């Protein structure tokens, strides 16, 4: 049987995430799926995005999250 296209696998992953009902289910899912460093990086980027949306300045965000200026800039470009 041929392997599904990458896009189809991505859609399946996102649909699975949408079907999670509790924070505990989400934590378990992501801890099973991701390495600790990957989770930490995602959490840091989420924090950066939240602070950018609040209108915080780069230096404050870098001090608060310990993210690099490159990470803050990358997240800002994606918003």
Locate the predicted segments by residue.
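An N-terminal domain-cap segment
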Residues: 31, 39-40
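N-terminal leader segment of winged-helix/HTH proteins
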Residues: 1-33
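Short helix-capping and inter-helix turn/linker motifs at the boundaries of alpha-helical repeat units
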Residues: 4, 38-39
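DNA major-groove recognition helix of helix-turn-helix
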Residues: 76-79
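Short, amphipathic alpha-helical "recognition" segments used to contact nucleic acids or chromatin
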Residues: 42-56
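Short alpha-helical "recognition helix" segments of helix-turn-helix
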Residues: 60-66, 72
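Amphipathic alpha-helical protein-protein interaction surfaces
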Residues: 22, 38, 54-57
């Amino acid at each position: 049987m041929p392997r599904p296209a990458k896009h189809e696998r991505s859609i399946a992953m996102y649909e699975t995430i949408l079907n999670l009902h509790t924070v505990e289910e989400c934590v378990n899912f992501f801890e099973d799926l991701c390495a600790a460093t990957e989770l930490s990086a995602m959490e840091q980027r989420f924090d950066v995005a939240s602070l950018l949306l609040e209108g915080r300045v780069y230096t404050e965000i870098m001090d608060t999250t310990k993210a690099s200026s490159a990470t803050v800039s990358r997240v800002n470009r994606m918003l």
